[in-house]
Structure formats: C-alpha cells, structure tokens
C-alpha cells in the first residue's frame, strides 16, 4: 500500500495500565481459534503456483479473441465472473494498492497521440515467455516474540508485500505491451482492408487516416478491457499467495497478536484486499471507533468470495455467530469495478502525464472548441465511482493516510 504505518507506543503513563486492556492480554485463549495446521494445511496454498509463464499473444487478433487468449494464458477462468461480481459490490478493494506509475510513464503504446501508438508496431518483436511468478527481493518477516516488536513487524510486512507486488507487476506490464501491439496490428489490418478495391488517389493515406480514427475511438477502450482482467489477476494472485503465507505465520502466534492495538484510519484500508495483519486479536478500531462484528463479517464475506484468508479478530467475533455475512448492495453507491477501473486508468494515463502534448485538432463549430482526440476508455469512470464530492471527501486517487499500530503493555 502507499502508506507508512504510524506507531503508537502506549506506556504505563499513557494508558495508566488499564485493567480492561490488561485482562485482554492475560485472558486471551488461543485455543479458541483451533489448530492452525488443520485450518490452512501449510504455508503453501493452492494459489501459490497457479501460473508459471505466459506466452506472447497472437501476432494479430481481434480484441475478442485476445481477451479469451488472455484468460487461457493466465489460467484465469474465474476472471469474467469476478469482474461481474465487482459490478454488484460497493467496497473499495483496490485504491490502497500502489499505482507504480513509473512502470508506465515511458510506455509509448499508451500515448494519447495515435501516431505514437502506430509507430510501436513498425518493427517486428521477438516472441518471448513472461514469468508471472517473479518473487520480490524482501522475504516475509516472522512475527515478533514480544509485543514490543509488533509496529516494526507490521511495517516490514507492508514493505515486503509492496516489493513482491512491484516485482510481479513489472512482468505484467511487458505482457500488456504485447497485447496492445496485437490490437494495433488488428486495427491496422482492418483499416487496410477497407480501402481494397476503392478508386481513390492515395489508398495508403486513406487507410492510415482510418487507422488513426480507430485508435482514438476503439483502441484505448479495448486496452482498458484487457487491463481490467490482467490487473485483477495480478492483484488477486499476489494477494492470495502472500496472504495465505502470512496467515500461516501469524496464526501460530495468537498470544503476541492479542497485545496488538490497530487502527484503520480510513475505511478503504479495512475493505482493501490486502491486510498486513490477519490475526488482529487485540483492540481494533475503524476510523477511531470500535470495529463491529457485523462489519467484520461483511468484509470477510468478500474475502471468502475472492479466495483470501479471513481477517480474525478475537475481541470482535461473536460466539456461535457465522464468520461471514453478505453485505447489502446499493446502486446509488460507488461500485468495486469502478474503483478498480479508476486505479487502472491512473496507470494508463502515466505516459500522457509525463509526456504532455498540445491537442492538434479541435471542433471549430462548437463554442467551447472541444478537443476531439480524447482517449475513449469506454464506460465513464467517474460515473461508476463518484457522487458529487464534498471538499473533505476521500477520493480513490488520494494517497491513504497511515494506519496506526501499537501494543498494550503489561
């Protein structure tokens, strides 16, 4: 996530050795959570090695064929179903993930200038395989033996996940480029075919003009569609692998995590697909208020649907109550797919931000001289995720405020 953990060290003077908190640490019964081994089997989950490599896509193919090819290459048959689910969910699962714009800022296939985009297919590319299981250089830290080590441990977990995600994303960006070029070649071939047999003076120029229009009207929309599938797979795969290993290590030390005090300063940190602490058995607060059992059950329902380990909170879970509960859905609230799309759009816009260009064509017949070369990503991103915001409202593109992590002293 794009945040650093703030640290709270609650000394004896600060907490005045609260009897309630002391009782939490002393009376925590780790047997309530059962046997860790029977719960998850081992540190390696069924998601750990689902995808080894992905080949380059077909040299030229229609976007529809490329979409199906990407599903097969990723072994992601659940992808379309999950994207449909995101249409009926309101939670923000993704905006706390790092955007890593620097990976895209020089990717010319994302240029807003159609001439730049077309120039990327002027030379033949080498066929290559993409390793989609690249690991980061930072190992998953072990839980501390004493509560005093919890703040540093949580920060190390956060850093380890960020490094792992970035390493994997670098491979995914290369795969995205090859798919973009396949779309360009398809549009190029389509434009050339439309001029065959026409009695015109310069068929090549006519074909090029039509290709430019296709880039503006269709290319960016098709790229966004592929990117939604690709980055949903990236985020889920990395988060699943990392989280199940994390859950295995944290579940073995419930007594240490019973002394944890953790605050999600923003709700989107709580609804996020990645959590640095999955065994949050101490005092947990959401936006400064005690976390409710129903809120925990609802977010765990989404996590179960996504194949992620549940967040366990020993002080919040209710006896003999289910661990999950389906949240309600409102058509008037932002949708999960909108948050994902907005997040991906920040990546796709990175080239244009670094290489700003003056618009070359404007509508002369319109009083506002509207630019006609705006990229068309398809559905209105803003309409999917945003109501008219107040000045204080947190938007998906805003960097998250740091959550706070501390420990209870004996």
Swiss-Prot record:
Description of how the protein assembles with itself and partners: Associates with the VP16-induced complex; binding to host HCFC1 activates VP16 for association with the octamer motif-binding host protein POU2F1, to form a multiprotein-DNA complex responsible for activating transcription of the viral immediate early genes.
Protein name: Tegument protein VP16 homolog
Chain residue ranges for the region called Disordered: 388-410
Gene3D superfamilies given in the database record: Alpha trans-inducing (Alpha-TIF) (1.10.1290.10)
UniProt family annotation: Belongs to the herpesviridae tegument protein VP16 protein family.
Record's function text: Transcriptional activator of immediate-early (IE) gene products (alpha genes). Acts as a key activator of lytic infection by initiating the lytic program through the assembly of the transcriptional regulatory VP16-induced complex composed of VP16 and two cellular factors, HCFC1 and POU2F 1. VP16-induced complex represents a regulatory switch: when it is on, it promotes IE-gene expression and thus lytic infection, and when it is off, it limits IE-gene transcription favoring latent infection.
Signal peptide (residue range): none
GO molecular function: DNA binding
Source organism per UniProt: Varicella-zoster virus (strain Oka vaccine)
Subcellular location: Virion tegument; Host nucleus
Pfam family, one: Alpha_TIF
Cellular component GO terms held in the UniProt record: host cell nucleus; viral tegument
Stored InterPro entries: Alpha_TIF (IPR003174), Alpha_TIF_sf (IPR036538)
